[in-house]
Amino acid sequence: MGAFKQPHGGMLKELYLPEHKADEEKLSASEHASWDLSPRQLCDLDLLLNGAFSPLEGFMTQADYEKVCDEMRLESGVLWPMPITLDVGEEFAQGVAEGDTIALRDIEGVLIATMEVSDLWQPDKKREARRVYGSTDDTHPAVDYLMNNAGPVYLGGKVHGIEPATFYDFKLLRDTPSELRGRFRKLGWRKVVAYQTSKPLHRAQQELTFRAAREAEANLLIQPVVGMARADENDHFTRVRCYEHVLEQYPEQTTTLSLLNLAMRMGGPREAVWHAIIRKNYGCTHFIVGLDHAGPGNDRNGEPFYGPYDAQELFQQHEEELDITMVPLKMMVYVENKAEYLPVDETEPADKIISLSDPEFGRRLQEGLEIPEWFSYPKVVEELRRAHPPKHEQGFTVFFTGLSGSGKSTIANALMVKLLEDGSRPVTLLDGDIVRKNLSSELSFSKEHRDLNIQRIGFVASEITKNRGIAICAPIAPYANARRQVRDLITPLGGFMEVHVSTPIEVCESRDRKGLYAKARAGIIQGFTGVNDPYEIPERAEIVIDTQDLSPDLAAHRILITLEKLGYIR
């Protein structure tokens, strides 16, 4: 029956309470403990509540979680490949018991849902990483979240929706499964091919999706992710404008666009099956699965996390049970002598095939060079040029890290003056001591508070970078994970340069005007970096500077030369 087939598990599980019950729940919510949802948790909750994650009725219990990790199945036996869990902090978990109700709120404190806590446990995260993602390497974004960001305790239980999360952007393009199924019925679409993407579409993608729908004798749903995808993806505002331009290239009444508020895990084969289940719940009959579908790229040794066909092979193993047809993505190439895109297996030996790699396309965007019209559409290129100005017009952050007394602040001040002298952009210095005084005065020097201080610095720097200014940060920043989070936050918004001021500790001690090292060695000060608290040496710093034989002026000049080589200044 095409688009009218049953949702996964047999029933669309929309979890919002009726209005009168939601009002009652709101009144009693103040009596419950409240958990402020992270962006990823809010995405998961949104798709739980609207039925996209059917047949789930809440965040997974331990029994469901363990069976999903080990067997890709719920306790009921229904196929489900991805753990959907609510991770919380240890302190919050200590105040919650099985049988309690908790309030789930967004970042502004708006009550989105309540949850009946039926289970709480401490998961074996390494085991989860190995079973679900096939690796414990935290260069995998899902493993990184799991090992370095997720709370230590999971809560499981049914959720009851109070009101949907508020989105102010592209409202007409956001659909629940029941709404999209209704649209398909209204249009008379009985077979629908779904295409997921988190990247802009160019001519090759338009051609392959149109061919896929035509060969399946179906209509086409383009359903891009606008929740959380890769950190290096374009912002979704830019992408959606690009999708709207590309939509004009399809024949009328054949294709529709709808946005999906999904937090991707980049989980490769399992993620492909998960994506298919979601599209089945939205009413689709076919799903396009690409090579290395939802793969995160290479591990820290330069090897791919997943093989190119792993996702298609796992999908095929479960295709009958999934009850949604896989459409393997065909590699499209541009044949210059025929002036058209063709599947690579339909080309002839005499054909002249030309291509433009993603890195080369990015370079041309960054440097304002010509993008051939055979590669993309002029309106798409125009949107991407606006989002990716030449590097010398972008904002950037220079992030110093090093021991107390290493020379960070002195070099940072010298660099600031030189950049102000250049005058191409506004410059802001976020020095460690100044930030402690004005932004983080209530924080201690515990590891938790040190990380929070670096998060604050990173947030301010990201806003400066996003608005095309220059941020110079000069904290000690002793912990690698906090530094990595700042890098990941800023990199999608502009340039990021980490400068490790590697001056030896004995030189730093000899410069100590405040006597802090002496107090630390005497045991008067605890948790002092380099003495009784570790400094984790950066592995990815763009520049390493030892100031014992280098003046601040020369050090700043060296940084300027590197910025010039990278194209951020002229």
Question: Would you name each region that the model predicts?
Answer:
Residues 1-392:
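Active-site cores that bind ATP or allylic diphosphates and position pyrophosphate for catalysis
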Residues 183, 187, 317-474, 478-509, ...:
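Glycine-rich phosphate-binding loop of ATP-dependent small-molecule kinases
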